[in-house]
Amino acid sequence: MEALVYTFLLVSTLGILFFAIFFREPPKVPTKGGKEN
């Protein structure tokens, strides 16, 4: 059971980090879906 909890925490942290980066990058580029969708 502990393994599941640790995995969930790891995935959650990674997800939050990715979301933070993904939402922080777009504002810098006014054009939507230019080089990367």
Curated annotation (Swiss-Prot):
Transmembrane segments: 3-23
Biological process terms in GO annotation: photosynthesis
SUPFAM superfamilies named among the record's database cross-references: Photosystem II reaction center protein T, PsbT
Alphabetical list of Pfam families matching this protein: PsbT (PF01405)
Family to which this protein belongs: Belongs to the PsbT family.
Subunit structure, interactors included: PSII is composed of 1 copy each of membrane proteins PsbA, PsbB, PsbC, PsbD, PsbE, PsbF, PsbH, PsbI, PsbJ, PsbK, PsbL, PsbM, PsbT, PsbY, PsbZ, Psb30/Ycf12, at least 3 peripheral proteins of the oxygen-evolving complex and a large number of cofactors. It forms dimeric complexes.
Protein name as catalogued: Photosystem II reaction center protein T
Gene field: psbT
